[in-house]
């Protein structure tokens, strides 16, 4: 018999768009020429297709020969991964358990998203993954308004043939100036069950501080009819391995805008943390973290230790060159 949480996964998966094809198709595949095959895996049906790189080669590699305008470019042996917890939400402000309830950002949260965008404005972004919740999507969209490449983030709609057809971009040049955004429920916040909508302070007074602390901070203990951090990690990490890591391996620079618990789960995987270590990990709203994926390994290059870009990120040579080319382009 399915557990209540398993059933909630199925319910969420049935109503939330999965954007079920490789985002790398966005730039070059014509609408009627996308070969697909379907496979069932971990709560979802995923459509896969032949991969086409979306990496921004304008600043990352030399221009192709004028005599060979479609000459393929050598893929980079490293890729940037940016993690951003969404800005403050209206329920963060009210000190309510939010979980999978879909609430927007506060004005402060909007400002945090914009400031996050300023910090990553010199880091290449080819592809964005968000949860299916509006606070994460708002954070991603607002952050990208600050990026120096001025590419436009576009949420992919592939939940139906009509949705895909109606949202198709027919200009190849416009597609080149866009960034695909994939929303996935697997990156949603931990589902807090019967705590969702309750005031955190009042809940502690009702059930006891120790009990609420176990529900919130333990790895294996779920709140009533909700998810434990372990259950959240199972879906978030599986999605990361199946969908995001292959994009990084292809040289695509990825940003993930998600939530405290889904991002803690992913960081546990990236940093090889124990179940005890991850319970003490805190992520600030609207502060981007930077990793470099190179030769199959993740290297942490930034943590929230300063308010300026220089105080947050240790650039690799490749990222430094990217910024230099942005600076040079700005002077033309």
Swiss-Prot record:
EC number: 5.4.2.11
Keywords: Chloroplast, Gluconeogenesis, Glycolysis, Isomerase, Plastid, Transit peptide
Subcellular location, record wording: Plastid, Chloroplast
Annotated positions binding substrate: 85-92, 98-99, 135, 189-192, 200, 216-217, 260-261
Swiss-Prot/TrEMBL site (Transition state stabilizer) positions: 259
GO terms for MF: phosphoglycerate mutase activity
InterPro entries: His_Pase_superF_clade-1, His_PPase_superfam, PG/BPGM_mutase_AS, Phosphogly_mut1
GO biological process, one term: glycolytic process
Broad enzyme group: isomerase
Pathway listed: Carbohydrate degradation; glycolysis; pyruvate from D-glyceraldehyde 3-phosphate: step 3/5
Source organism of the structure: Arabidopsis thaliana (Mouse-ear cress)
Name of the protein this chain belongs to: 2,3-bisphosphoglycerate-dependent phosphoglycerate mutase 2
GO cellular component, one term: chloroplast
Superkingdom field: Eukaryota
Swiss-Prot/TrEMBL catalytic activity: (2R)-2-phosphoglycerate = (2R)-3-phosphoglycerate
Function of the protein: Catalyzes the interconversion of 2-phosphoglycerate and 3-phosphoglycerate.
Family affiliation: Belongs to the phosphoglycerate mutase family. BPG-dependent PGAM subfamily.
Pfam entry (one): His_Phos_1
PROSITE patterns: PG_MUTASE
């Amino acid at each position: 018999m399915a557990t209540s949480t398993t059933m909630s996964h199925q319910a969420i998966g049935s109503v939330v768009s999965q954007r079920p094809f490789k985002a790398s198709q966005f730039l070059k595949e014509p609408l009627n020429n996308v070969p697909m095959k379907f496979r069932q895996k971990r709560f979802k049906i995923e459509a896969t297709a032949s991969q086409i790189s979306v990496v921004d080669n304008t600043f990352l590699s030399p221009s192709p020969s004028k005599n060979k305008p479609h000459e393929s470019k050598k893929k980079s042996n490293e890729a940037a991964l940016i993690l951003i917890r969404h800005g403050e939400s209206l329920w963060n402000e009210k000190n309510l358990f939010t979980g999978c309830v879909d609430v927007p950002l506060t004005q402060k949260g909007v400002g945090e998203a914009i400031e996050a965008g300023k910090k990553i404005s010199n880091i290449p972004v080819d592809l964005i993954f968000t949860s299916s919740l509006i606070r994460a999507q708002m954070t991603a969209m607002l952050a990208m308004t600050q990026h120096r490449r001025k590419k436009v983030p576009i949420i992919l709609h592939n939940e139906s043939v009509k949705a895909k057809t109606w949202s198709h971009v027919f200009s190849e040049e416009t597609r080149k100036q866009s960034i695909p955004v994939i929303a996935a429920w697997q990156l949603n916040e931990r589902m807090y069950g019967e705590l969702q909508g309750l005031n955190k302070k009042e809940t502690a007074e009702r059930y006891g501080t120790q009990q609420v602390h176990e529900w919130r901070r333990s790895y294996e203990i779920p709140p009533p009819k909700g998810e434990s951090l372990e259950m959240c990690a199972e879906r978030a990490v599986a999605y990361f391995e199946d969908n995001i890591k292959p994009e990084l391996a292809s040289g695509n620079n990825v940003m993930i805008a998600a939530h405290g618990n889904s991002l803690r789960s992913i960081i546990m995987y990236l940093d090889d943390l124990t179940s005890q270590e991850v319970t003490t990990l805190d992520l600030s709203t609207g502060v981007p973290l930077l990793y470099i994926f190179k030769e199959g390994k993740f290297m942490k290059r930034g943590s929230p230790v300063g308010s300026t870009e220089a105080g947050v990120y240790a650039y690799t040579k490749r990222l430094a060159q990217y910024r230099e080319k942005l600076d040079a382009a700005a002077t033309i």
